[in-house]
């Protein structure tokens, strides 16, 4: 691991403040990053003071004046070069993601691949950023719309995808002509510093204005500074619903924009017409992948009563084959939770299930002993519950899968939608009418609705986000880029008269 840290220029003590070209040690508290894999100290980071933050934002303001004037395809070419850098460091960065966050090495590498993919997407986007033309009711007039850069984009990212979500926002914002200030999770600061180190050579070689890529490591207060800062027209925040409400209220109070990607309480409906050999692996990966710490993790399984016992038995067998341990070992399926607080949340949730009368098809357990020295490893469990129970309505970031029976598809969809969150959903069925009903206006109310695949593992080509307490924001693909720009409608008169719209007469 030390060789990887050296390659990524991660030291025992690290500078947590950067304007892209310059870096320095913040005047705030020192943050220590411990690996949930083995409990060992990876490194420390000097976090930001308010003065450090203001310096980064001030530099970003100056950089925007120049960056917005660079042609979008040129900005896209710079992003292309960044994608090449991430290809070069994919193994090292993916390994650090796995070690600092705790997800499997395959998932860590996959997260870096997401950065590469969004870079590729953004390069093509840089030659589009299209507006529309409209026909004017007035003779010798032309109407169209165009999109302009917005300014500083504040990015608040979460620990579970410590680098991918940053890239979804940043690469699109950059080709749109914006500049970025990134507040990474204080639980995974070293991966953020590694990303800044990786792109620094590209910034320098292209004479990119200092301040285009800002990094401010710190705690909750940094997020509060971003949210209240009128110099930051857009704040994109990923995290809990509680955090998102605070950000949304603060940004909304100053009439700024917020892009919120918050909690999920995702369900899969398993129809009596499902292909179970196809469904079971998707359910298991959705429930235990990243130790249940994805926004799109499968939390609830809504099973037709006629196949309930069969599905439960298949899942119990599959869970019995799961290998839990060091995520850097490719033979293991499940790594640790992020920290001891997450373990306590897991324990509290399973205790509530028991208190409400729930039963466990696969028993919960906190793992100790050889290989589990960090205290962050838990056994994925399966509980039989009722959908209306408060603990089932709540998102617990842990590998707990709730089983729920249904009789009719209408009932299943009502159960699926019957939670405060609305991120991801899925149905397994070979019945065309069931699939189409699930995808219809009367079907899933989530931002993501899948058929015959699970709730997690979204590609970057589609817009990512959800409804209700998930926040309503959209990141990544499709036309999510529009959130990072300001729309302008233009009317051009190339005639010699001045007719007014709606036939209004005004003569002087």
Each PLM stretch: what is its role?
Residues 39, 75, 97, 119, ...:
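Residue-level signal for inorganic ion chemistry
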Residues 42-130, 140:
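Glycine-rich loop-to-alpha-helix module at the N-terminal edge of alpha/beta enzyme cores
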């Amino acid at each position: 691991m030390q060789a990887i840290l050296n390659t990524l220029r991660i030291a025992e003590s690290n500078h947590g403040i950067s304007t892209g070209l310059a870096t320095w040690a913040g005047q705030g508290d020192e943050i220590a990053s411990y690996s949930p894999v083995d409990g060992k100290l990876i490194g420390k980071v000097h976090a930001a003071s308010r003065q450090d933050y203001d310096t980064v934002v001030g530099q970003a303001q100056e950089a925007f004046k120049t960056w917005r004037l660079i042609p979008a395809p040129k900005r896209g070419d710079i992003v292309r070069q960044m994608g090449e850098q991430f290809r070069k460091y994919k193994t090292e960065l993916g390994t650090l993601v796995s070690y600092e966050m705790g997800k499997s090495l395959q998932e860590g590498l996959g997260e870096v691949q997401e950065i590469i993919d969004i870079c590729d997407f953004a390069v093509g986007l840089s030659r589009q950023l299209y507006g529309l033309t409209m026909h004017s009711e007035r003779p010798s007039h032309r109407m169209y719309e165009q999109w302009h850069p917005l300014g500083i984009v504040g990015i608040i990212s979460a620990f579970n995808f410590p680098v991918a979500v940053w890239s979804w926002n940043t690469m699109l914002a950059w080709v749109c002509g914006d500049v970025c200030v990134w507040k990474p999770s204080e639980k995974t600061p070293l991966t953020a510093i590694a990303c800044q180190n990786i792109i620094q050579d590209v910034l320098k070689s292209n004479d990119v204005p200092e301040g285009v890529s800002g990094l401010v490591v710190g705690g909750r207060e940094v997020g509060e500074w971003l949210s209240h800062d009128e110099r930051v027209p857009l704040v994109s925040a990923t995290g809990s619903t509680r955090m998102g409400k605070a950000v949304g209220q603060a940004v909304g109070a100053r009439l700024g924009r917020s892009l919120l990607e918050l909690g999920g309480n995702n369900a899969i409906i398993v129809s009596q017409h499902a292909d179970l050999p196809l469904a079971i692996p998707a359910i298991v990966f959705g429930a235990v992948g990243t130790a249940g710490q994805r926004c799109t993790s499968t939390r609830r399984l809504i099973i037709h009563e006629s196949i309930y016992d069969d599905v439960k038995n298949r899942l119990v067998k599959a869970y019995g084959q799961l290998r839990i341990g060091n995520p850097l070992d490719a033979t293991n399926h499940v790594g640790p939770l992020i920290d001891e607080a997450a373990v306590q949340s897991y324990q509290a949730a399973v205790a509530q299930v028991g208190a409400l009368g729930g039963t466990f098809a696969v028993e919960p357990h906190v793992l100790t002993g050889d290989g589990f020295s960090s205290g962050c490893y838990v056994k994925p469990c399966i509980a039989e519950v009722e959908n209306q129970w408060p603990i089932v309505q709540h998102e617990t970031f842990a590998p707990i899968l709730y089983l729920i029976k249904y009789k009719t598809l209408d009932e299943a969809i009502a159960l699926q939608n019957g939670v405060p969150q609305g991120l991801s959903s899925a149905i397994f069925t070979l019945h065309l009418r069931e699939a189409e009903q699930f995808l219809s206006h009367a079907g899933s109310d989530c931002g993501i609705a899948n058929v015959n695949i699970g709730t997690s593992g979204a590609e970057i080509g589609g817009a990512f986000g959800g409804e209700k307490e998930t926040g309503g924001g959209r990141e990544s693909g499709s036309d999510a880029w529009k959130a990072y720009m300001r729309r302008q409608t233009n009317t051009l008169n190339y005639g010699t008269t001045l007719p007014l719209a709606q036939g209004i007469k005004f003569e002087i």
